Structures are given as structure tokens and as C-alpha cells.
């Protein structure tokens, strides 16, 4: 019966019609999960996502990721489940594989993977699943990468802010050291400093509003411009400057809605997280159909977010 309902090619048209008539008479509703588990047309896709449990302020990014992937999966008739890093944090590669196989998972879209996530690196290297990594520059036969050009984007927003406001010294508040995007954005800042002959002071902010605030209190008086590797840190820096009663141009990175409520307009890199995730699901569909892994780079925008831009 399940083979007839799920469109298997080796079921005759006569049998399929009889099953459909019985379904109507019995008012039977197929279980979509069971259908996905029994169907061999396409495997299920896991969305593996790392939540920031220390703050709720950046939940918008993960929600946009989930919305983009799930809506596109519905359009492509792919079944998806959401798995959080915290669920598999202490598992080895074999345990993760067993879990995903038990869920009929054939593809994984990974969000927030760091350089130190060695078990995930092992899964990628051993090609156990079709994988799309977001913001990670790793590609092999079964793995694709999708992201904006973080080095160029960081260069663009910082250069625009420096040229608009002048100044020869920059405090750069970076993200987490094990993050691939952190290294790429840092490279963009170092290139800008070389080209424009700027003094560059680099401090690790871990994408934390609180740490950015503390670093601003400590170093802002000695620099001309503050460049932050995330909007959340830019907001922390701006609030600290207001309390210090001094002005320094600040720019961020991401384009989250919260920037519209910051009180001061700041340049930022606008990433379309919904589109990135939707494209990641498209790429997963291509991999599941036998395509080879590849690197995909999407465009970015430099914008100034205003309150009017974020209210509905």
C-alpha cells in the first residue's frame, strides 16, 4: 500500500487505482513522516544549527536560516528535520552517522560550524553524507560551500566608513577565533590597513555585545574609527561611546533588524540569510541528485539601517 501511495514505479496502474479508492473509502490520511521514511525518491535533509544560548538578540539570523531552508524544502518536496549542535556535542562520528541513518537522513546543511568542530570535519572528509556548509570554505565531491565573500564585504564596509569620516587608526573588534568567517573578515581588514596605510588595533570580541562594550571603554579614546565584525558588537560599541560622551564612527556586519533600533545609523554589511539558506537547500537538492560539490559565493550589500526600514 505504501509503495502505491508513494509513487513507486514498480506498482501497476490498476493496483494504484484500487489503493486510491480504498484510501478514499476509509478516509485514510498518509503519515508524512512514514512516507518520507519509506520512500526512496529522495532522502531527508537535516538542518544542523548552532544556537547562541547566551543571548536572544541574534535569534533572527537562525530563524531566517530555518525559514529559508524549510520553505524551499516544501517547494522541492524534500522532508527536513532540525537538529541542534547541543544534541550531538559529545558524540563521535559513528554515533552521529548512526543517528542520522536511523532518521533516514541523506543530506545535512550545517550552520555555524567552527574550525574546532573536528567530528563534523571527519563526517565531511569521509563523505558519509551529502553536505552543504554555510560560511565554511570546504568543498569535496559530496560537500558544497555557500557564503558571501566575507573578506571583501568586511573590506568594503570598513573602507566606506573610513573614507566617509576620515581617520587613520582603527579599533577592529573581531569574532570568535575558531570561526572561518572571523579569519576571512580579519584578512579584509588587514588588506585595507595595508592599502590605506592605517593603524589597526585588533581585539577579540567573540561576537559578544558585552565584550565589544568593554573593549570600547578601554580603547576607543585612542582610535579614530571602530569596526565590528557583527552588528551586535557594533551596538555594544555605540552604547559605550554614548556613555563615554565621545563620538567615533562605528560599523557592523550582518544587517540584523536590531540595528534599526540602535539609535545611531551605522554602516553594515547586509546578508540575506533567508536567501542564503534557500540557496543552500537548492544546492542540497542538486547534490542528492548526483551533483558534485562546489563553492558558491552570493552577493552582499553595504547599507545604513534606519528605524523606518525595520518597522512593519
Model regions and ranges:
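An alpha-beta-alpha
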Residues: 157-196, 292-311
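Hydrophobic alpha-helical segments within soluble ligand-binding/sensing domains
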Residues: 146-172, 209-217, 234, 271-289
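Short beta-strand elements in bilobed, periplasmic/extracellular small-molecule ligand-binding domains
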Residues: 73-85, 172, 189-211
Amino acid at each position: 500500500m505504501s509503495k502505491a501511495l508513494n509513487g513507486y514505479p514498480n506498482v501497476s496502474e490498476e493496483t494504484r487505482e484500487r489503493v486510491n479508492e480504498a484510501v478514499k473509502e476509509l478516509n485514510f490520511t498518509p503519515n508524512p513522516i512514514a512516507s518520507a521514511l519509506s520512500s526512496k525518491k529522495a532522502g531527508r535533509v537535516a538542518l544542523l544549527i548552532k544556537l547562541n544560548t547566551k543571548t536572544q538578540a541574534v535569534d533572527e539570523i537562525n530563524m531566517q536560516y530555518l525559514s529559508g531552508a524549510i520553505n524551499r524544502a516544501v517547494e522541492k518536496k524534500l522532508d527536513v528535520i532540525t537538529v541542534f549542535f547541543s544534541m550531538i556535542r559529545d558524540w563521535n562520528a559513528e554515533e552521529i552517522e548512526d543517528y542520522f541513518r536511523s532518521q533516514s537522513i541523506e543530506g545535512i546543511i550545517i550552520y555555524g560550524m567552527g574550525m574546532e568542530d573536528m567530528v563534523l570535519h571527519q563526517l565531511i572528509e569521509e563523505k558519509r553524507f551529502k553536505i552543504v556548509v554555510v560560511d565554511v570554505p570546504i568543498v569535496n565531491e559530496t560537500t558544497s560551500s555557500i557564503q558571501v565573500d566575507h573578506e571583501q564585504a568586511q573590506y568594503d564596509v570598513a573602507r566606506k566608513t573610513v573614507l566617509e569620516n576620515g581617520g587613520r587608526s582603527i579599533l577592529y573588534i573581531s569574532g570568535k577565533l575558531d570561526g572561518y568567517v572571523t579569519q576571512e573578515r580579519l584578512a579584509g581588514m588587514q588588506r585595507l590597513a595595508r592599502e590605506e596605510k592605517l593603524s589597526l588595533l585588533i581585539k577579540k570580541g567573540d561576537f559578544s555585545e558585552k565584550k565589544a562594550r568593554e573593549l570600547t571603554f578601554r580603547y576607543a579614546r585612542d582610535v579614530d574609527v571602530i569596526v565590528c565584525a557583527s552588528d551586535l558588537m557594533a551596538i555594544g560599541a555605540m552604547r559605550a561611546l554614548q556613555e563615554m560622551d565621545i563620538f567615533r564612527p562605528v560599523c557592523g556586519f550582518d544587517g540584523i533588524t536590531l540595528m534599526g533600533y540602535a539609535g545611531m545609523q551605522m554602516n553594515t554589511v547586509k546578508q540575506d540569510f533567508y536567501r542564503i539558506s534557500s540557496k543552500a537547500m537548492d544546492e542540497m537538492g542538486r547534490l542528492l541528485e548526483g551533483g558534485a560539490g562546489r563553492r558558491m559565493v552570493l552577493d552582499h550589500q553595504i547599507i545604513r539601517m534606519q528605524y523606518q526600514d525595520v518597522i512593519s
